């Protein structure tokens, strides 16, 4: 038998946008993201598995961005002090070479979220503003020049009456970009004015935004809303999270490392998925609350007949395929190899044989989903720590949301 020679300089780039992406162990990427969110809120041990399924698939920066989004949506209002710790740990991660010590930082952050209280306030405010038309009962917000002279009395009304939905709509959708800082100044001064200043926290929101490198306008608006809701939360008899931080030992990381075949011990590639896929993608039936990529494709056909193609869009699989000079064939949804040697060597290492797996294994990734939950039920489940009480018609009207 010959040997596959590296000719990577001649390989066509894999740059077409796919309908789905398979991860390291052939879960659908967007579903791993959503299951991670819900498992963290449910305080489940499986949270760590889903976090590392994304992380070790090569989506390292995306995992950090997702955890920031989760933090601002669900945790910031009750745990504002965690912000600086999060910044510190991400900075450490960015300066370290790839080691287990570096990788365990994700474990530390997720573990810290699991022990902290959370609510749905910011998340629901964002979703309602995104999915419904909120009438602010005025058209002057279209004129940014009128901000200083007209808006302030309206803001006073909103803040004094705790009209969180109008505040959110203004921050997220109506406020002009060049007026965001001015509105933040107004909010800051409001909470520094007696009697509010006796209970609120002196956190500099602008400083927090500046600490988050490469913050775009959407994230900036998200942070501002979370900051305002945190200050309102301080005015209520709600228990805030404690400054506790989890220590993670390297020995705890072994279970999340990528599993490879080992012919010497007769552990062949087709044995990887049954061992590695520890959890089903939707054990708690939350996924039907969201818009999913699987709705745009024949998922079973993709999994059984074209998994290599859809996996090639994950960095870990892209690098594996590139090592054996594979090229994505976008027309046939296959991976083409330049010769039999490259083909054989790739499959000697990674022939997962999805079409031969037991249903128990394949269903971990491509199970049929059951529509059992509504957002109104999720709100009832997590409303204890929140201060925002959405109108019932909003909760009933929320269907499949895009996160």
Label each PLM-derived region with a short phrase.
Residues 31-37, 43-53:
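Conserved helicase/translocase motor-coupling segment
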Residues 24-25, 45-49, 55-403:
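C-terminal alpha-helical interaction modules of replication/initiation AAA+ assemblies
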Residues 4-36:
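Long, low-complexity, highly charged intrinsically disordered regions
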